[in-house]
């Protein structure tokens, strides 16, 4: 799973699954942010396979509404360490900055409104809503719908121009 939203001077990538290798990171021209819906293999495995990570060392901010920055750092550094991956990605690519989710909102302030909601998925997951100039996109990845979510999801998605929802 990997989706990209480009708005004005900001590039937002949601999850870095296998499709991430096709994303042209344009961070010399735009602020680049990666946010994760959750941390299952199919949503993080492509991070190291994007060639643009290795040719420009402008900062890329990485975050998730699902957990704090320390937990996210622990998850990604464990996955991309010498134990499970042939290179220690975060020690080699110092421009990958793991930050608290509120730091992403500060960066995006005035550019795009970003909000999140908790989803049902083993290990947890969160959905995101992106709003700008009256238009909105909602992403709900791997949500395992249950009736007790109905009202919250109706409110979170209300008025959205596009809802991307895949479920199990």
Residue ranges: model-predicted function:
Residues 144-168:
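Cap/insert and terminal regions of metallo-dependent hydrolase folds
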Residues 140-142:
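DG-centered beta-turn motif at the end of beta-strands
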Residues 1-138:
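Binuclear metal-dependent hydrolase catalytic cores
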């Amino acid at each position: 799973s990997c989706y990209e939203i480009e708005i004005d001077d900001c590039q937002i990538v949601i999850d870095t699954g296998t499709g991430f290798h096709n994303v042209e990171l344009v961070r010399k021209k735009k602020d680049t942010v990666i946010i994760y819906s959750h941390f299952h293999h199919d949503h993080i495995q492509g991070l190291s396979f994007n060639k643009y990570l290795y040719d420009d060392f402008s900062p890329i901010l990485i975050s998730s509404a699902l957990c704090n920055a320390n937990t996210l750092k622990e998850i990604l550094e464990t996955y991309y360490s010498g134990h499970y991956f042939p290179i220690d990605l975060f020690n080699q690519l110092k421009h990958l900055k793991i930050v608290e989710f509120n730091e992403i909102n500060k960066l995006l302030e005035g550019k795009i409104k970003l909000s999140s909601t908790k989803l049902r998925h083993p290990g947890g997951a969160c959905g995101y809503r992106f709003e700008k100039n009256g238009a909105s996109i909602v992403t709900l990845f791997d949500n395992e719908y249950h009736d007790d979510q109905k009202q919250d999801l109706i409110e979170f998605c209300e008025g959205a121009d596009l809802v991307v929802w895949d479920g199990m």
